[in-house]
Amino acid sequence: MTNDIKEIQTIQPGLSEIKEIKGELANVKKRKRRSKKINKLTDGQIRINHVSSEKKRRELERAIFDELVAVVPDLQPQESRSELIIYLKSLSYLSWLYERNEKLRKQIIAKHEAKTGSSSSSDPVQEQNGNIRDLVPKELIWELGDGQSGQ
């Protein structure tokens, strides 16, 4: 029976050992805690900085929209403009540009074929012989990505 008591004592720490472990854990916790970050700005200064940053962001956004309005023919500077209207009219204009670009490329190819008397593949952009690519400069070839269509 005394062996059983000794085994229990070795398995279970005594009260003094528990207090010692708790003290060590408390010291570890104290070392891990960080002091609260001290903000050098007052609440008023923080608010003023936030307001001025937001104002700069809005001004930049307005300037970009103004540039877009100047470029897209359907948008007039004097009309009231919502972002949605600007996006939709810009998308419509870009689609028109893609279609127009494709028509012009086909006209160039047709004129070339009429001059040379040869016919090219159905998709001149994909043609590998180089003749069509020489006719139409690379910067003039616009292609819509997969899943996109010119409305």
From Swiss-Prot:
Domain bHLH: 45-97
Disulfide bonds: none
Source organism superkingdom: Eukaryota
Keywords: Activator, DNA-binding, Lipid biosynthesis, Lipid metabolism, Nucleus, Phospholipid biosynthesis, Phospholipid metabolism, Transcription, Transcription regulation
Alphabetical list of InterPro entries matching this protein: bHLH_dom, HLH_DNA-bd_sf
PROSITE patterns (alphabetical): BHLH (PS50888)
Annotated stretches, region: Disordered: 112-137
Stretches with biased composition (Polar residues): 116-131
Gene Ontology terms, MF aspect: DNA binding; protein dimerization activity
Additional free-text comment from the UniProt record: Present with 521 molecules/cell in log phase SD medium.
Functional summary from the UniProt entry: Transcriptional activator of phospholipid synthetic genes (such as INO1, CHO1/PSS, CHO2/PEM1, OPI3/PEM2, etc.).
Subunit structure: Efficient DNA binding requires dimerization with another bHLH protein.
UniProt name for this protein: Protein INO4
The species this protein was found in: Saccharomyces cerevisiae (strain ATCC 204508 / S288c) (Baker's yeast)
Gene encoding the protein: INO4
